[in-house]
UniProtKB/Swiss-Prot annotation:
Protein name per the record: Phosphate acyltransferase
NCBIfam families: plsX (TIGR00182)
Pathway: Lipid metabolism; phospholipid metabolism
Top EC class of this enzyme: transferase
Gene transcribed to yield this protein: plsX
PANTHER family: FATTY ACID/PHOSPHOLIPID SYNTHESIS PROTEIN PLSX, PHOSPHATE ACYLTRANSFERASE
Family according to the record: Belongs to the PlsX family.
EC annotation from Swiss-Prot or TrEMBL: 2.3.1.274
Function: Catalyzes the reversible formation of acyl-phosphate (acyl-PO(4)) from acyl-[acyl-carrier-protein] (acyl-ACP). This enzyme utilizes acyl-ACP as fatty acyl donor, but not acyl-CoA.
Chief location of this protein within or outside the cell: cytoplasm
Length: 371
């Protein structure tokens, strides 16, 4: 029999995060190590852990820091990386991924974290949590290391949907600005629309239409629109939020992660080249550690699914314990700030503005009625 949560941790002041222990490349042991790292750093976080209960209990028992802070949900099935989203939607009720989202849907947890199949996670999230009213396509927002004071820029969509028309890109701008405002304490985020150049005549027709829409809503939605931006601006200082479609965004983030790993590898090779370079590495060890930390993809592991009735964090399938801990920290931070509720209010107000503008004026209505 599965243990029941202690009032979802609210009595002790904890914020409960629902975690899918399965689906990651390294198995549940790494997930448990990751939540243990989070628990050690943050006494206010508790967990509902989903997967084969007997296996998970043995792993958790080895981590004293998790004593009394984990509730188990026994799930016999696992969503694999090869499973098609449509199959998971039809047959995935007994999977750890489904159960993880169900805890958020039922109000037992403030957010969900999973390393599993991205397509399946998005499909199940839309099925179980539903989209916010007014949202056509949810988006995945990620944090990209940047030269800005906050250290990161928000990029969305990072792969939820390869399609995005002008209205979708407007919604991404609104949701991305809200994420930056609540997650990074930026009162008036700067938003840029990714294009092949900054000149207004460049880009596809839908990008030009999106540019006009995002500029039109900037004042009412309390963000600054800087216009078109290029790929070089993603880690730059020109804007805080970069808006694009899921195909382009996913390519950008994967390229950035690969580049960061390559730089780290090249630096290690360079400092091993000669005795003098080894000495130089010892003298610069503090600066090198700071640089390594800034560009480490694990520190920003976790894409946020925006546009849903609940907070869902998608962790990399290859995440280690540091990456899992970063994803949990993100879920906790957003839950603590009341981000889901604020985003829902922002999207609802934007939808109302759109409806108001689309509604006919009195003269137009009379003209339509006379037809």
């Amino acid at each position: 029999m599965t243990a029941q949560p202690d009032q979802t941790g609210s009595a002790s002041g904890q914020i409960i995060i629902s975690v899918d222990a399965m689906g990651g490349d390294a198995g549940p042991s790494v997930v448990v190590a990751g939540i243990a790292k989070s628990a050690k750093k943050n006494p206010q976080v508790g967990f509902i852990l989903h997967g084969p209960e007997d296996t998970l209990k043995k792993l958790v028992a080895k981590r004293r820091v998790l004593d009394g802070r984990v509730v188990f949900r026994d799930c016999p099935d696992v969503v694999t990386m090869e499973d098609k989203p449509s199959q998971v939607v039809r047959n995935g009720k007994n999977t750890s991924m489904w159960s993880t989202l169900e805890s958020v849907r039922n109000g037992e947890a403030a957010g969900a974290v999973s390393c599993g199949n991205t397509g399946a996670l998005m499909a199940l999230s839309m099925l179980r949590l539903r989209r916010l009213p007014g949202v056509t396509r949810p988006a995945i927002a990620i944090l990209f290391p940047s030269g800005n004071p906050q250290g990161f820029n928000v990029l969305l969509d990072a792969g939820a949907d390869i399609r995005a028309d002008a209205r979708d890109l407007l919604q991404y701008a609104l949701m991305g600005a809200s994420y930056a405002r609540n997650g990074m304490n930026l009162l008036r985020p700067r938003v840029g629309l990714l294009n092949v150049g900054t000149e207004e005549h460049k880009g596809k027709a839908e990008l030009k239409e999106a540019q006009a829409l995002i500029a039109e809503y900037a004042e009412r939605a309390n963000y600054e629109f800087v216009g078109f931006v290029e790929g070089s601006d993603i880690p730059g200082k020109r804007c805080d939020v970069i808006v694009t479609d899921g195909f382009t965004g996913n390519v950008a983030i994967k390229t950035g992660e690969g580049t960061a790993r390559m730089i780290g590898s090249l630096l290690r090779e360079a400092f091993k080249y000669s005795p003098l370079s080894r000495l130089a590495s010892l003298l610069a060890v503090t600066s090198l550690r700071r640089l390594s930390k800034r560009i480490d993809p694990r520190r920003v592991n976790g894409g946020v699914f925006l546009g849903l009735n609940g907070t869902v964090i998608k962790s990399h399938g290859s995440a280690d314990d540091t990456g899992i801990s970063a994803a949990v920290k993100l879920a906790f931070t957003l839950a603590q700030s009341g981000f889901a509720e604020r985003l829902a209010a922002r999207v609802a107000s934007a939808a109302a503005l759109t409806q108001d503008e689309a509604a006919p004026t009195g003269a137009q209505a009379e003209k339509q009625e006379s037809r």
